[in-house]
């Protein structure tokens, strides 16, 4: 049987390396290409077209390493977000502590998926990629922009500790 007729190896290798890293008490980090269609990550944390995501159980909730995509919930800067990454965009998985892991080689199945997704995205209207997860609205509604610098915390003098009995 020709390799092009087989299902992609990436989801199976990803799950195997993930389990292996956890079994060795290492922190699994996922490298994602954010330029590919279908990637839903907090873009403000992306650098040079990539983002590195900590997918350790203590860092994410509802992690799904499916055959077609990686999905989970996580907090970025204290804000809960839902992350969805097609397997075509997963470039590598490695350990934070020592770099052990692997980079994934290109696979024909993902090249086809990416070209199909590009065609669909070109013909589709602009869609909202992110949505509010818990339905809460912001406490204030002002004209601040996400690119503005956050306000500085008030400087009140020396910090103090109290004894609570």
From Swiss-Prot:
Q: Name one GO biological process term.
A: positive regulation of protein catabolic process
Matching entries from InterPro entries are given as: SspB, SspB-like_sf
Region Disordered: start-end pairs: 119-165
Q: Name one Pfam family in it.
A: SspB
Output compositional bias ranges, type Basic and acidic residues: 134-143
User: At the top level of its lineage, which domain of life is listed?
Assistant: Bacteria
**Which SUPFAM superfamilies does the record match to this protein?**
SspB-like
- What cellular component terms from Gene Ontology apply here? cytosol; ribosome
Q: Which NCBIfam families match?
A: PRK11798.1-1 (NF008762), PRK11798.1-2 (NF008763), PRK11798.2-5 (NF008769)
Instruction: List the PANTHER family hit by this protein, alphabetically.
Output: STRINGENT STARVATION PROTEIN B
The family annotation for this protein states: Belongs to the SspB family.
Known role:
Enhances recognition of ssrA-tagged proteins by the ClpX-ClpP protease; the ssrA degradation tag (AANDENYALAA) is added trans-translationally to proteins that are stalled on the ribosome, freeing the ribosome and targeting stalled peptides for degradation. SspB activates the ATPase activity of ClpX. Seems to act in concert with SspA in the regulation of several proteins during exponential and stationary-phase growth.
User: What is known about its subunit structure?
Assistant: Homodimer.
Q: What is this protein called?
A: Stringent starvation protein B
Taxonomic source organism = Shigella flexneri
Instruction: From the UniProt record, report the name of the gene that encodes this protein.
Output: sspB
């Amino acid at each position: 049987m020709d390799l092009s007729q087989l299902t992609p190896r990436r989801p199976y290798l990803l799950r195997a390396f993930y389990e292996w890293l956890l079994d060795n008490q290492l922190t699994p980090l996922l490298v994602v290409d954010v330029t590919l269609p279908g990637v839903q990550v907090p873009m403000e944390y992306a650098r040079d077209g990539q983002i590195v995501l900590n997918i350790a159980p203590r860092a994410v909730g509802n992690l799904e390493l499916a055959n077609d995509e990686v999905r989970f919930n996580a907090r970025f800067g204290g804000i809960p977000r839902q992350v969805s990454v097609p397997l075509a965009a997963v470039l590598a998985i490695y350990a934070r502590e020592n770099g052990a892991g692997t980079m994934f080689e290109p696979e024909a199945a993902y090249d086809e998926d990416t070209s199909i997704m590009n065609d669909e995205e070109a013909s589709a209207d602009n869609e909202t990629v992110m949505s509010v997860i818990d339905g809460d609205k912001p406490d204030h509604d002002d004209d601040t922009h996400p690119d503005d610098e956050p306000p500085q915390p008030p400087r009140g003098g020396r910090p103090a500790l109290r004894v609570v009995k």
